[in-house]
Amino acid sequence: MTSAYCTVLSKGRLYQAVALFKSLEQVDQDSPIFILCMDEDTHRVLQKLKMKQLNLVPVAALENELLLKLKETRDQSEYCWTMKPIFLQAVLNSNPELERVTYIDGDLFFYADPSPIFENQPDCSVLLSRGDIVIPSFEKEQIDMLQRLLGRYNSGFISFKHDDAGTDCLEWWKERCLEECKNAPGEGKFGDQGYLDYMSELFPNVCDITTPGVNIGHWNYGQHTFSWKDGRIVLEDGSPLIFYHFSGYRIVSINEIKQIHETTRTDLPFVHELYQETLPHIIQHMQTLDPEFNGFASKDDNK
C-alpha cells in the first residue's frame, strides 16, 4: 500500500517531533512524512535535518482569506488543530497515488513497524484510536465526566483511506473544524478531537483500531504492563508496543524536561525514562545543526 504520514508542527514541539521522525525512520523508511510548518523556524530547521522522508509545506501555501481571518480569532493550538484535516486533504489531492494518509501528533514515538495497524483492517476507510480513560486513582464519576468532555477518541493518530467514505469523512471533519475548534473541553466538542465521536454514525467503514500497542498514553497506560522481550518492548499479552503518545512534555531546557500530566503518579512505564534519555541527544543534534534555534518552553507552560 502507498501511504503517507502527515503532521502539523510549530517550533514549540519541534524537539519531540524530530524524535518522532527518527523513531519512524527506524521502523518504516518507505512512507513519506508530510509536515505543515506553522512558522519559519520549523521550516528552516527541518530543511537542515535533511531526512529523505520529510516533505515540508509552509503554512502560507494553504492559507486563504478564510483561514487568515480564523487565525486572528483562534489561539495557536486551535489554529493548528483547524489545519489538520485541511492539510490531510491537501496531501491527498496533490498526491493522487496515495492510498492512505495518516495523521500523527508530533509527540508520538514509534517502537515497532506500524504496518499491521492497516493490514489488520484493510476494509476500513477511517481508522480511529480509542481514547478511553483508564486511571486507577480516579473515581468512576471523574472518569465519566472527563470522557464526556474530551470524547471517546484521541486525534493524535487518525487514518483516512483514499476512497469515497474516507474522503467524505475527511471533508466533513474539515468543515466542522472550520466552524468551531475551541481549546476548551465541552460535551460533544473539544478542538478537532470531539468530532471524531460522530464519524461512525455518519459514514460507513469507520473503525476503531483493533491492533494492540497503538497510541498508549497518560490516559490509559494503567491498563498495561511493559517489558523487554527479544530486544523489543512488549505488552502484557506479548504484543509489541507499536507507538507511545508522550503527551504533556514541556522541554524547558536540555536539563529540564517536565511532564505536566504526571506530576503525582509514581507508576510511569519505563518507556518514559528511555524517552527522557533520548530527548537531550535530539536537542544537542539540533543545536549543532542550527545554533540560533530555540524551541524551549517557558517554565510556566502548563497548557
Swiss-Prot record:
It comes from the Bacteria. This is Uncharacterized protein YfnF. Pfam families: Nucleotid_trans. It comes from Bacillus subtilis (strain 168).
